[in-house]
C-alpha cells in the first residue's frame, strides 16, 4: 500500500499535527500504564529534533462530546511527557482558532473528544484542525478503523497527510503477514465465540495454510467434528458454519482436551481424549498431545498470525495450551505478528515479547485489517499519496 511516510519529509520549521494514540489509563491524575505514550515518543522526538513546530493530540476515555471534563483531560499525559522529554510541554485547551509555536516546541492539544463534531467527522471541525498545520501525521493505528475528524477528516484537508512511524510499521508488518505471506502460513484464532470472530475466520481461511482455533471457538469445531463437548461454551447454531470452514481450510481439531466440572480457578484439570468428554464436562484448554501437535505445525511455519489464547490461560491449571503455543511461536524462525488484548496479556504472562516479530498496537483496527476491511484512515492516506 502506498502512503507518504513522515520520515521521508523535511519537517524543519513546519507546523506538524500528530494524531497519536495516547488513550492511557489514569488514576488520581497519574498515568498508570504508559505503553502507548512510550510507543509514540520516537515520532514526537523525530519531529522536535527536525526543528518542527509540533502539536500532538489524542482522545482519552469517553467524555460527552463537546463538553470539557477534567477526568478525561490530557493533562496527566502532558505531565508524563514533561518528564520523559525533559522539556517544557504545554497543554492547549482552546486551539481551534490557531496557535503560535516556535520551532522545536511541543504543545499537546486537549482531548479531541471535547470538540463537537469529532466522532461524526464533521467537515467544519476537520478544516479547523487542518488550518493548524502544514503537515498532518496519522500515527494512531488503534483508531485507524474510525472515520473521525482527527483521524480522517483533517487528513483530507491538510496540505500534506502522511503516516507516522508507528502506523507505517504496523501496516508493513500486517501487509507482510496478510498480503504475500512466506509459506507455510499459520493463523491462530482464539476467543470465546465463533460469532465474534466469524469474519476473521472466513478471511484467514482463504489465506492460511493451517488455521488453528482455540478457546471457546475450538469447542464449536470439536462439536462439528462429531464429538460431545458436554457443558462447554460452544455455539450449536454455528456448527454447520464450522463444518464449511473445515472443508475449505486445514483446521486441526484437538485430539485431547483439559476439562473440569466447574469454571473455577482451583478446579483440577482432567486430561481426556475428545471422544471421552462427558455430558457434565467443561473444556477449558487443549490437552498435551494437541498442544504438541500444534507446536510442531508452528515450528515449520514461515509466517504466523496470532489472535487470541487457546484456553483459559488466566487459570494456572488451564494455561498449558496457551503457554505451549506461546513458546512455539517464540522458538519459531518464521515471521510472527500478534494482536488483541488477551493475546498481549498472554505474551506478557509467558515472557515472549522479545521473540514475537511484531506486536500490534490496535485492538479493533487489527481485527478489521485481518478481516480484510478497508481502514478509513489508511484509505485517506492512500488517496492523499496520489
Swiss-Prot record:
Q: In terms of one coarse class, where is the protein primarily found?
A: cytoplasm
Q: What is its EC number?
A: 2.7.2.3
**Which positions bind substrate?**
21-23, 36, 59-62, 113, 146
Extract the GO molecular function terms from the UniProt entry.
ADP binding; ATP binding; phosphoglycerate kinase activity
Q: Which PROSITE patterns match?
A: PGLYCERATE_KINASE
Alphabetical GO CC annotations of the entry are:
cytosol
The question of whether Metal-binding is a record keyword is answered with no
Residues that coordinate or bind ATP:
197, 314, 340-343
Q: Would you kindly state one Gene Ontology biological process term found in this protein's UniProt entry?
A: gluconeogenesis
- Catalytic activity from the UniProt record: (2R)-3-phosphoglycerate + ATP = (2R)-3-phospho-glyceroyl phosphate + ADP
Q: In which pathway does it act?
A: Carbohydrate degradation; glycolysis; pyruvate from D-glyceraldehyde 3-phosphate: step 2/5
What is the enzyme's class at the highest EC level? transferase
Instruction: List the Pfam families.
Output: PGK (PF00162)
Q: Which Gene3D superfamilies match?
A: Phosphoglycerate kinase, N-terminal domain
The answer to whether the entry has keyword Membrane is no
Q: Where in the cell is it found?
A: Cytoplasm
- Could you tell me the keywords of this UniProt record? ATP-binding, Cytoplasm, Glycolysis, Kinase, Nucleotide-binding, Transferase
Question: Belongs to which family?
Answer: Belongs to the phosphoglycerate kinase family.
Please give the subunit comment from the record. Monomer.
This one is known as Phosphoglycerate kinase
Q: Which organism is it from?
A: Vibrio campbellii (strain ATCC BAA-1116)
Amino acid at each position: 500500500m502506498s502512503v507518504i511516510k513522515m520520515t521521508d519529509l523535511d519537517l524543519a520549521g513546519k507546523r506538524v499535527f500528530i494524531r497519536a494514540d495516547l488513550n492511557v489509563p489514569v488514576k488520581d491524575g497519574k498515568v498508570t500504564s504508559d505503553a502507548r505514550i512510550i510507543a509514540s515518543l520516537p515520532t514526537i522526538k523525530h519531529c522536535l529534533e527536525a526543528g518542527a513546530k509540533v502539536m500532538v493530540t489524542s482522545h482519552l476515555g469517553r467524555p460527552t462530546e463537546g463538553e470539557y471534563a477534567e477526568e478525561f483531560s490530557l493533562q496527566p499525559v502532558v505531565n508524563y511527557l514533561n518528564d520523559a522529554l525533559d522539556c517544557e510541554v504545554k497543554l492547549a485547551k482552546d486551539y481551534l482558532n490557531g496557535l503560535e509555536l516556535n520551532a522545536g516546541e511541543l504543545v499537546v492539544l486537549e482531548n479531541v473528544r471535547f470538540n463537537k463534531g469529532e466522532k461524526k467527522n464533521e467537515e467544519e471541525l476537520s478544516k479547523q484542525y487542518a488550518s493548524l498545520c502544514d503537515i498532518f501525521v496519522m500515527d494512531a493505528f488503534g483508531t485507524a478503523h474510525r472515520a473521525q475528524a482527527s483521524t480522517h477528516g483533517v487528513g483530507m484537508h491538510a496540505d500534506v497527510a502522511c503516516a507516522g512511524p508507528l502506523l507505517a510499521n504496523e501496516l508493513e508488518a500486517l501487509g507482510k503477514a496478510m498480503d504475500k505471506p512466506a509459506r507455510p502460513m499459520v493463523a491462530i484464532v482464539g476467543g470465546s465465540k465463533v460469532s465474534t470472530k466469524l469474519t476473521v475466520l472466513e478471511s484467514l481461511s482463504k489465506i492460511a495454510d493451517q488455521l488453528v482455533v482455540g478457546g471457546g471457538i475450538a469447542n464449536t469445531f470439536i462439536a462439528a467434528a462429531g464429538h460431545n463437548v458436554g457443558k462447554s461454551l460452544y455455539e450449536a447454531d454455528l456448527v454447520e458454519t464450522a463444518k464449511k470452514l473445515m472443508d475449505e481450510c486445514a483446521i486441526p481439531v484437538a485430539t485431547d482436551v483439559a476439562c473440569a466440572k466447574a469454571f473455577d480457578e482451583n478446579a483440577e484439570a482432567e486430561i481426556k481424549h475428545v471422544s471421552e468428554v462427558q455430558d457434565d464436562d467443561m473444556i477449558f484448554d487443549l490437552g498435551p498431545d494437541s498442544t504438541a501437535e500444534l507446536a510442531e505445525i508452528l515450528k515449520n511455519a514461515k509466517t504466523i498470525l496470532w489472535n487470541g489464547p487457546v484456553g483459559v490461560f488466566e487459570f494456572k491449571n488451564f494455561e498449558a495450551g496457551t503457554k505451549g503455543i506461546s513458546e512455539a511461536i517464540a522458538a519459531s524462525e518464521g515471521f510472527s505478528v500478534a494482536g488483541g488484548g488477551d493475546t498481549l496479556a498472554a505474551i506478557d504472562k509467558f515472557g515472549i515479547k522479545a521473540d514475537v516479530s511484531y506486536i500490534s498496537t490496535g485492538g479493533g483496527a487489527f481485527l478489521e485489517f485481518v478481516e480484510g476491511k478497508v481502514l478509513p484512515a489508511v484509505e485517506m492516506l492512500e488517496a492523499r499519496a496520489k
